[in-house]
Swiss-Prot record:
Record keywords: ATP-binding, Carbohydrate metabolism, Kinase, Nucleotide-binding, Transferase
Entry GO MF terms: ATP binding; kinase activity; phosphotransferase activity, alcohol group as acceptor
Protein name: Anhydro-N-acetylmuramic acid kinase
Keyword ATP-binding included in the entry's annotation: yes
CDD domains according to UniProt: ASKHA_NBD_ANMK
UniProt superkingdom: Bacteria
UniProt pathway annotation: Amino-sugar metabolism; 1,6-anhydro-N-acetylmuramate degradation; Cell wall biogenesis; peptidoglycan recycling
GO terms of biological process kind: 1,6-anhydro-N-acetyl-beta-muramic acid catabolic process; amino sugar metabolic process; peptidoglycan turnover
Gene: anmK
Length: 374
């Protein structure tokens, strides 16, 4: 198997930065060695957000965004390589998820579109890149998401303890690691996405640090009930969603029924939406003894406190306490998925995505052999 050092790259639905992780990976271990977060320029972030909310653009504009984002990913990887004094031949491959701008896994022509030209990353770094992870699963009848539960199973499953892993990025997703049962998982709904969108529009802040603003407000129960009446929350698994659905336009449509609300009350209610929609799915799935939380939302003390309050009898903690950085989990997962692709191993879990069969995922963008001798 192609063991060695891999790099994972993930920007996520929150667009709060490009996470880059270096790890040593083989069939027995995933050992994180270094990481960094690379900033996304505001203009690029806003252009991506506009696409995700359905704003029309020309093919030329889409092509330019694809190249610019790929170049940014390449710069982020180079920064990590320079930080760790690494050369191209030291890295087997880079696993790059890309930036999802549209995810529509149902209908006549199911699809998922990520941008961030992987050729740009290869050209800048001299390292082979593995990308386009989702579309094979969709071609096999799956949702193409979530893909991270397979990684959660490999690292965090316990032989006796009922565990669930909760990733709170822009979207929140659950992985159910129940002994003796196939792994299941799906997107529960918005994680940080709506909270971040609201504070960005209201206060031009990227996120609500330590939930300081939300703590100034109060939960508006009728508004929360309106949020939760969206059909996505009651839809059966397998299911997945993204910014093309839960975006600022969605929030505006709900708020139109409640004119004059204080902005901080809306923020407090969005925190409660995230916590309630997650906890309901945990309970509907039979509950767990330990809920291991990762992603940006694990750093939100109000979200964590509400989850603990809504899930009595469950130990709500972070993956950091299990030895895996919650901030780097998704980037690490795509480094691991790149390893599986290079090794010719299946990367999806049909019990999670609904695909007809397990499959090797992704496309390989090989580096020039003179650069990449791994």
């Amino acid at each position: 198997m192609k063991s060695g050092r891999y790099i994972g790259v993930m920007s996520g639905t929150s667009l709060d930065g490009v996470d880059v992780v270096l790890a040593a990976i083989d069939e027995n271990m995933v050992a994180q060695q270094a990481s960094l977060t690379w900033p996304i320029p505001v203009a690029l972030k806003e252009a991506i957000l506009s696409i995700c909310q359905g704003q029309q653009l020309t093919l030329s504009q889409l092509g330019q965004l694809d190249v610019k984002l790929g170049a940014l990913f390449g710069e982020a990887v180079l920064a990590l390589m320079h930080q760790e004094n690494l050369h191209p031949q030291d890295i087997v491959a880079i696993g790059c998820h890309g930036q999802t701008v549209w995810h529509e896994p149902t209908g006549d022509a199911p699809h998922s579109l990520q941008i961030g030209d992987n050729n740009q990353i290869v050209a800048k770094t001299g390292v082979t890149v593995v990308g386009d992870f989702r579309r094979r699963d969709i071609a096999l009848g799956g949702q193409g998401a979530p893909l991270v539960p397979a990684f959660h199973e490999a690292l965090l499953a316990h032989p006796v303890e009922r565990r669930m892993v909760l990733n709170i990025g822009g979207i929140a997703n659950l992985s159910m690691l129940i002994p003796g049962q196939p792994v299941r998982g799906y997107d529960t709904g918005p994680g940080n996405m709506l909270m971040d969108a609201w504070i960005w529009r209201q206060r031009r802040m990227a996120y609500d640090k330590d939930a300081q603003w939300a703590r100034e407000g109060k939960v508006i129960i009728p508004l929360l009930q309106t949020f939760l009446s969206d059909p996505y929350f009651a839809a059966p698994a397998p299911k997945s969603t993204g910014r093309e659905y839960f975006n600022y336009g969605w929030l505006e449509r709900q708020l139109a029924q409640f004119p004059g609300l204080a902005a901080q009350d809306v923020q407090a209610t969005l925190v409660e939406l995230t916590a309630v929609s997650i906890s309901e799915q945990v309970l509907l799935s039979g509950g767990c003894e330990r809920l291991l939380v990762c992603g940006g939302g694990s750093r939100n003390p109000l979200v964590m406190a509400r989850l603990a309050g809504l899930l009595p009898g469950t130990e709500v903690t972070t993956t950091d306490e299990a030895g895996i950085s919650g901030d780097d989990m998704e980037a690490l997962a795509f480094a691991w998925l790149a390893w599986r692709t290079v090794a010719g191993l299946q990367g999806n879990l049909p019990s999670v995505t609904g695909a007809r069969e397990a499959s090797v995922l992704g496309a390989i963008y090989p580096a020039n052999p003179r650069h990449n001798q791994s």
